[in-house]
Amino acid sequence: TLSLHDALPIYDYLTFHDFSLKYLIDKYGTPFRLTYLPRIGDQIKKAKNLFNKAIKANNYKGEYFYCYCTKCCHFSHVINEALNHGVHLETSSSFDIDLIRRLFEKGRISKKTFLIHNGHKTDDYLDKIVGLLDDDFENVIPVMDSKVEIDRLLARTKKDLTIGIRMAINEEPQSAYYTSRLGIRSTEIIEYYKQKLARKKKVKLKMLHFFVDSGIKDTLYYWGEFRKALKIFADLKKICPSLDSINLGGGLPIRNNLAFEYDYKYMIEEVVRNIKEVCQEEGIEEPNIFTEFGKYTVGESGAIIFKVLEAKQQNDAELWYLIDNSLMNTIPDAWSIFEKFILLPINKWK
């Protein structure tokens, strides 16, 4: 069983990037997980190339920064491969800061690497973020997930702070909930800046972050939330000169079915064009663009191989395969949100 693409049957067996899966099965048995590292680099290079081309084509003045979400996959070989291609890093928990420390100790990142700190900030998480500041990491950006986080952060350090704000979004119409638990309400951000952040001499607001669960998709819902975020960015920029970056949370989609189609070039061009258009309309400078890609970075690089132990025909239409592990255990994230994935046999192609 294979949950990836770029796999072709040769000699009655499926291969992955021209590598024999049968060889691995014969050597290691099943089940096992594999990662094809070159695919990670391919994905990063593709996104960087398309954003930089769109920036050049639109005579866009801001820069582009690709961030890898460490929570997506913590395996050292995966993160090291991503870092080989010049990514910056996004964290969402105190555990991720330990990982950041280890990467720095090994020389894999520098103190100039952008570190975007998202998520709810526990005391331990805040303490570790402050620890990075105290050790003179230059591009630490804690993103405020609620209005109270800034006071909790300032109580821990006398250092100057460069921060972001996360804008809460409305969920898709078919969602079970109307709002997101993360971020500050869009209608409250301007007032929050005026009444709170603007009065803090040691605080510089650099980034507006918004995250759409569906990812960057060509839908009315996505473009509606996107344009709302751009309007708030423009209004903020007019009263906050230090605001120079917009962070597009929610990644690019990956191939999860054999008929997958997505025009990456068009969507990235539209993202850049829309930002430039709003900036021209509002008379503001074009911001740097940050993206946070986790699943997009690694999702097409890995596979899990199972053995079918028994096939059970339970009625005329349903044939069940009993496998030698559990989807709940091996792909809990995909399993829990009913995510689709490619499933292919390795043998019996002829």
What are these regions (language model features)?
Residues 223-246, 258-288:
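Catalytic cores of soluble, metal-dependent hydrolases
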Residues 12-19:
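N-terminal glycine-rich anion-binding loops that anchor highly charged ligand groups
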Residues 213, 246-256, 291-295:
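Glycine-rich beta-strand-to-loop/alpha-helix junction loops that act as flexible
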Residues 1-8:
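Short, small-residue-biased leader/transition segments that mark boundaries at the very start
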Residues 65-245, 254:
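Active-site-proximal beta-alpha core segment in soluble small-molecule metabolic enzymes
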Residues 218-224, 255-267, 298-310:
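Short glycine/threonine-rich loop-to-helix capping motif typified by GTGT followed
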Residues 20-22, 26-51:
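An N-cap/entry alpha-helix motif that binds or orients negatively charged groups
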Residues 270, 276-280, 284-350:
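Charged (often Lys/Glu-rich) extended helix/loop segments that serve as interaction or gating elements
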